[in-house]
Amino acid sequence: MADSKKPAIKKPVPKGDRKANRRGAARLAAVQALYQMDIGGAGINETFAEFESHWIGNEVEGDQYLPAEAAFFRDVVSGVVRDQKKLDPLIDDALAKGWPLARIDAILRAVMRAGAYELEHRKDIPARVVVSEYVDVAHAFVEKDETGMVNAVLDQIARQFREDEFTRG
């Protein structure tokens, strides 16, 4: 995504306020925030303030942004920022040879960093759920081939951090 316009969450606000919907919206917002920080150089506090007051749960430029679990959004964004120097080599190792993370589109870097953070630190969420959720987030921004790369990278990282979840029957 070459331009600096923030990708819109174009799903209608769901009926009810299920935790899964709010977490999915938080993941999408976290990826957008990480992308914005990567491209625009905004700081974490400025980004939190902007997203929480102007984007999450609001209508912006005709698009309705879903309500999100703010604590989860903050955890993912702050965790990625804090652990990025550890997460990036994990992602690099999982990428195909000749495709360093620096060569990957900024939105995909944000997706993979957020997914890798959750896989390492959010053991309360099953690994397969994390991988699936971030593949879904990637679908909002990129073509199917690129979502396959996200799936492969996050699956490899999941097996590294949560091998037991893949060896049980």
UniProtKB/Swiss-Prot annotation:
Region (Disordered): 1-23
InterPro entries recorded: NusB-like_sf (IPR035926), NusB_fam (IPR011605), NusB_RsmB_TIM44 (IPR006027)
Keyword terms of this UniProt record: RNA-binding, Transcription, Transcription antitermination, Transcription regulation
Molecular function (Gene Ontology), one example: RNA binding
GO biological process entries: DNA-templated transcription termination; transcription antitermination
Keyword Transcription regulation: yes
Keyword Cytoplasm found: no
Record's GO cellular component terms: cytosol
Function: Involved in transcription antitermination. Required for transcription of ribosomal RNA (rRNA) genes. Binds specifically to the boxA antiterminator sequence of the ribosomal RNA (rrn) operons.
NCBIfam families listed in its UniProt record: nusB
Similarity-based family: Belongs to the NusB family.
The protein, known as: Transcription antitermination protein NusB
